[in-house]
Amino acid sequence: MTPEETQKAATLIWEKWDADELLDELPEDCRPQTELEAHAIQSVFPRVSGQPQAGWKIAATSKAGQQHIKVDGPLAGVILKGRILENGAECSLNANAMGVIEAEFAFRFGELVPPRERVYTAEEVLSRVSELCLTVEIPDTRFKALGGKLQLLAECACAWWLVKSEPVTMNWRDLDFKSHQVTVAKNGEKVAEGSGANVLEDPREALSWLVNDVGSRGVSIGAGELVTTGTCVVPVPVSPGDEILADFGVLGQVETRFN
């Protein structure tokens, strides 16, 4: 794709987001044919939206998530600063085509993680992390029929709203993330339960996957960027009026409600 075609695709997707409208698919002259082209479209979103990049998300780190968006593996997506909300925020479901929430662990980097030829281990990645946060993600798509892997990548892997907690204050570095239980209650009733094992076996492994995936394209993870690692529970359907509480046990809770 030419830079002009990349810009056209990103602009079209963003305009549809802004207008609460859906697409059948991207026009043929700006439809990505490779993952590299799809990620190039992502990289333009901060410019076309006027919002700086705040971090990354990982979609489809669990089998349930992969089945939900019809892909066979995880996807990395850019998160824009204007899409991150504080704990307790009210979210709009207006024109949301997916209508689900996900409960996730998120890690903020305290220093730059540059690309390199040798892959980063989970331990090396975690040593560069300064904070753990808890999140509820509200993903969405602008494609009427979940437009296939490449188009989903092009729209930042379904990144939309992300409600996050304050940084966890307890010592979390020795936590067994894999077995740590997470529950979700909707309108006061528990509706989902899972654990970190649903996130590529361990959220820390998912985090290192993201770092190495991004680095393979010559992209750094910036100091201060937040990475939300994928859902610990089966995606929970939500409707306007619902109140959600994601409970991460001793680590804390995240709440949001929908209008």
Indicate where each model-derived feature is located:
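Carbohydrate-binding surfaces in secreted/extracellular proteins
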Residues: A246
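Catalytic-core "active-site belt" of small-molecule-metabolizing enzymes
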Residues: T2-D202, S239, E243, L251-N259
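A conserved acidic, glycine/proline-rich C-terminal tail/linker
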Residues: L207-P235
